[in-house]
């Protein structure tokens, strides 16, 4: 989070910096939606300064920031917690932006800049400060931008309803923000045009949003906005910002693994080229751009050199993960192996390069292991080297936590690497399934339900006819499925129904009717589903009996035709014989 960057400055300089910045803001109290003690007015009062500063320390709570920087010292953390609590009270009691107001603002994104600016001022007055303002300050707009980001999913639904472009609304908002950033520097006639920590954080928040939308061109423009004003933000040990470096690696060095095109051997047909798929193609949480390519190879090596020397960069899980993906995308697997050995002392050989393992960077996480696995598969088109290194990590770092994304990627890659002509039963994928069960059993945990993992295993079950695998999957995920169904997850429910119908169909076709009844009793999950499965089972049994009946009748008909043909041949033989 951006306030962490200020730890390296003396406390008095930080206080002086923010005192100077916040003195330009009106200290007039703003009405909040709360209750003052011993008051009947039903409005509590906090100065604007309190919750502007408070916004800076609730990034991980309110904004759900998915990447972190170096650790804040204990003294600064205790001070920041007080500011955060004041802001949290404001947000807890505050009324979210209503739908009517959001529609008005989104509709105004098609207007010119002045009209859009007036609409944003109206939104601020409607939701934060009822005091009318002709022009919003940069701090007000920053606060509003973060508030809108927390409601981005609601904004997306509204955009669909009113047929407005969701990405255009956000880019219009950023354009207004960038204009105010430059106008502020022109007003005070600053020679140093560098963005401050708050502005860098806001810009990176917008980059993250556009990456999620698949709008990489807009994300590139915002990244250039940062780099033009802070040219040393990537390679300076003193001023390096982890969030900006991560986004640079993602946008310009290939560290967006969901965009990578992976060869799918399981769909290869004889005489045809292998089908190329993207890892994120089936993921609905992000949208993928139609094109993606890395552009800057030289800066990557400089960033890697800096990251391997700076402790604060080595402690960033997100930075190391994107660095690994960048090397993988550019085919630099030898450099990648040396980096892994330098940071975690794990080599591609069976044993680690040191007797005593002592990592120099952050403890290996699921995110880092996914990046290693995907990077090696992208270059080798085989899981052998990646799984060998993965096995060493699990052996020598027993506390590593493997989340749902890790297992999803493992099943995706093992499925893509599977060649049906050489392995009809998909034993490599089944082996990964048993590995997952053993890991969760060793940790005494239950596997979390993941749609893509279920879909990959369903495809394997259907292609190989391995219905015991499907039953085993439902048995292992049963507690999670029951919990997910209670939350009304439509996609998971649909894939579960596919499992059930496929297994019932296989059991009925094999005549195992008692096993079908037992399966429905164990995995019906609720009364309605059990009823539907019984109806489906009855239909399949009826179709099977009809098919068997037709098969018997056809067999009798063929036998009769054969006998009649034999009798005719015999009669012909007798006639020909008498003629001779």
From Swiss-Prot:
Gene Ontology cellular component?
A: mitochondrion
Q: Where in the cell is it found?
A: Mitochondrion
Which Gene Ontology molecular function entries are recorded, alphabetically? RNA binding
The signal peptide annotation in the UniProt record is: none
Q: Which InterPro entries match?
A: ATPase_expression_mit
Which Cys pairs does UniProt list as disulfide-bonded? Answer: none
UniProt transit peptide range: 1-40
Record's keyword terms, sorted: Mitochondrion, RNA-binding, Transit peptide, Translation regulation
Q: Name one GO biological process term.
A: regulation of translation
Chief localisation class = mitochondrion
The family assignment reads:
Belongs to the AEP2 family.
Query: Which proteins does it associate with, and in what oligomeric form?
Result: Binds to the 5'UTR of the OLI1 mRNA.
Protein role: Required for translation of the mitochondrial OLI1 transcript coding for the mitochondrial ATP synthase subunit 9.
**Protein name, as recorded:** ATPase expression protein 2, mitochondrial
The gene name on file is AEP2
């Amino acid at each position: 989070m951006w306030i962490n960057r200020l730890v390296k400055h003396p406390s008095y300089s930080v206080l002086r910096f923010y005192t100077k910045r916040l003195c330009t803001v009106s200290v007039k109290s703003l009405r909040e939606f709360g209750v003052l003690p011993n008051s009947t007015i039903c409005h509590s009062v906090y100065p604007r300064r309190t919750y502007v500063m408070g916004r800076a320390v609730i990034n991980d709570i309110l904004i759900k920031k998915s990447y972190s920087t170096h650790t804040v010292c204990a003294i600064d953390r205790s001070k920041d917690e007080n500011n955060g609590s004041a802001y949290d009270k404001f947000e807890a009691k505050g009324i979210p932006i209503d739908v009517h107001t959001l529609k008005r603002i989104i509709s105004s994104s098609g207007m010119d800049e002045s009209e859009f600016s007036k609409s944003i001022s109206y939104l601020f007055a409607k939701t934060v400060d009822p005091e009318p303002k002709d022009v919003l300050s940069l701090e007000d707009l920053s606060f509003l931008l973060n508030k809108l980001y927390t409601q981005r999913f609601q904004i997306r639904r509204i955009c669909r309803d009113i047929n407005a472009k969701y990405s255009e609304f956000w880019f219009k908002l950023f354009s207004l923000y960038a204009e105010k950033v430059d106008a502020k520097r022109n007003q005070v006639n600053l020679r140093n045009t560098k963005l401050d920590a708050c502005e860098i954080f806001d810009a990176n928040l917008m980059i993250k949003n556009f990456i999620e939308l698949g709008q990489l061109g807009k994300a590139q423009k915002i990244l250039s906005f940062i780099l033009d004003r802070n040219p040393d933000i990537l390679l300076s040990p003193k001023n390096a910002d982890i969030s900006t470096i991560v986004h640079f690696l993602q946008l310009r060095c290939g560290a967006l693994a969901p965009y990578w095109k992976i060869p799918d051997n399981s769909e290869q047909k004889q005489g045809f080229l292998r089908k190329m798929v993207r890892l994120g193609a089936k993921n609905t949480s992000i949208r993928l751009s139609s094109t993606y390519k890395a552009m800057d190879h030289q800066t990557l090596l400089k960033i890697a050199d800096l990251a391997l020397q700076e402790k604060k960069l080595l402690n960033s899980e997100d930075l190391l993960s994107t660095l690994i993906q960048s090397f993988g995308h550019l085919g630099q697997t030898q450099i990648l192996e040396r980096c892994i050995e330098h940071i975690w002392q794990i080599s591609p050989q069976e044993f680690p390069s040191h007797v005593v393992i002592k990592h120099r960077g952050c403890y290996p996480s699921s995110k880092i292991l996914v990046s290693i696995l995907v990077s090696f598969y992208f270059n080798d088109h085989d899981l052998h080297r990646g799984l060998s290194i993965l096995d060493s990590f699990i052996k020598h770092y027993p506390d590593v936590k493997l989340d749902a994304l890790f297992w999803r990627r493992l099943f995706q890659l093992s499925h893509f690497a599977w060649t049906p002509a050489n392995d009809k039963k998909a034993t490599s994928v089944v082996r990964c399934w048993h590995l997952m069960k053993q890991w969760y059993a060793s940790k005494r945990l239950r596997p979390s339900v993941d749609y893509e993992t279920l879909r990959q295993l369903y495809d394997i079950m259907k292609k190989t006819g391995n219905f015991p695998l499907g039953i085993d999957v439902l048995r292992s995920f049963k507690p999670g499925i029951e919990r997910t169904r209670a939350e009304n997850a439509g996609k998971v429910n649909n894939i579960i129904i596919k499992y059930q119908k496929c297994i019932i169909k296989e059991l009925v076709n094999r005549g195992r009717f008692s096993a079908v009844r037992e399966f429905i009793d164990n995995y019906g999950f609720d009364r309605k589903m059990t009823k539907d499965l019984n109806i489906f089972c009855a239909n399949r049994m009826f179709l099977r009996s009809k098919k068997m009946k037709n098969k018997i009748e056809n067999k009798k008909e063929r036998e009769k035709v054969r006998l009649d043909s034999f009798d005719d041949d015999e009669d012909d033989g007798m006639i020909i014989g008498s003629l001779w």
